[in-house]
């Protein structure tokens, strides 16, 4: 899997074995285009009151 891994969707990395999901975290109070974190994960982190988490399972899907 290849996931974007910077706040701006410019760079990606190949995920280590076992981390087959890409994720993107956004502050709910900021514009949706401003991601605070992106990367690879094995399980999708849960959203909270302030942070929305979106996970996906295709290459570079966490734009």
UniProtKB/Swiss-Prot annotation:
Disulfide bonds, paired cysteine numbers: 3-22, 15-40, 44-55, 56-61
Subcellular location: Secreted
Signal peptide as annotated in the record: none
Keyword set, alphabetical order: Disulfide bond, Secreted, Toxin
Matching Gene3D superfamilies: CD59 (2.10.60.10)
GO cellular component: extracellular region
A molecular function GO annotation: toxin activity
InterPro entries: Cytotoxin_Cobra, Snake_3FTx, Snake_toxin-like_sf, Snake_toxin_con_site, Toxin_cobra-type
Organs and tissues of expression: Expressed by the venom gland.
Origin superkingdom: Eukaryota
Pfam families: Toxin_cobra-type
SUPFAM superfamilies the record matches: Snake toxin-like
Extra remark: Is classified as a P-type cytotoxin, since a proline residue stands at position 31 (Pro-31 in standard classification).
Family that this chain belongs to: Belongs to the three-finger toxin family. Short-chain subfamily. Orphan group XVI sub-subfamily.
Protein name: Cytotoxin homolog S3C2
Organism of origin: Aspidelaps scutatus (Shield-nose snake)
């Amino acid at each position: 899997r290849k996931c974007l891994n910077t706040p701006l969707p410019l760079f990606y990395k190949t995920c280590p074995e076992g981390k087959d999901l890409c994720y993107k975290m956004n502050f709910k109070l900021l514009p949706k285009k401003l991601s605070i974190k992106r990367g690879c994960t094995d399980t999708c982190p849960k959203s909270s009151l302030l942070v929305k988490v979106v996970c996906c399972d295709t290459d570079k899907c966490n734009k």
